[in-house]
């Protein structure tokens, strides 16, 4: 499948998984697919381990809900250490879906994800799709037909 297809597919699934949340919107799911799907996927691609992606996701949710007390992906939050109230257009605040459904988060998190993807490419960690890979020798050392 290759790196880029795997990243795109998992980002779409990550965004779609948030459609079941209360207060979810299609724009919110697309925003999450872009920002978090790319950023968290890039975390994995850079380290080839899930721990960084899990840590970034957990830190995002903790800071958003546990510190600022704001909505997390449309699920509400409870009380944080600080009572933050975002006012303004939903496009800038994310509305009831939370700040991750805002254009601000999309731009900042996608930019961070793209920066990490550039590092992935620079380090030679991109795997091409199977139809673009050179044929490999079989177990007996011969080339496949």
Predicted segments, located by residue:
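Transmembrane helix-loop-helix hairpins at the membrane interface
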Residues: 1-144
């Amino acid at each position: 499948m290759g790196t880029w297809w795997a990243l795109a597919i998992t980002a779409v699934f990550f965004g779609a998984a948030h459609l079941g949340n209360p207060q979810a919107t299609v724009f919110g799911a697309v925003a999450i697919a872009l920002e978090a799907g790319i950023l968290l996927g890039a975390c994995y691609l850079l380290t080839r381990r899930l721990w960084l992606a899990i840590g970034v996701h957990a830190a995002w949710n903790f800071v958003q809900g546990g510190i600022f007390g704001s909505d997390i992906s449309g699920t509400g939050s409870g009380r944080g250490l600080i009572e933050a109230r975002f006012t303004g257009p939903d496009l800038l605040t994310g509305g009831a879906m939370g700040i991750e459904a805002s254009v601000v988060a999309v731009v900042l998190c996608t930019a961070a994800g793209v920066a990490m993807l550039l590092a992935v490419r620079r380090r030679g960690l991109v795997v091409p799709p199977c139809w673009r890979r050179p044929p490999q020798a079989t177990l007996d050392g011969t080339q496949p037909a």
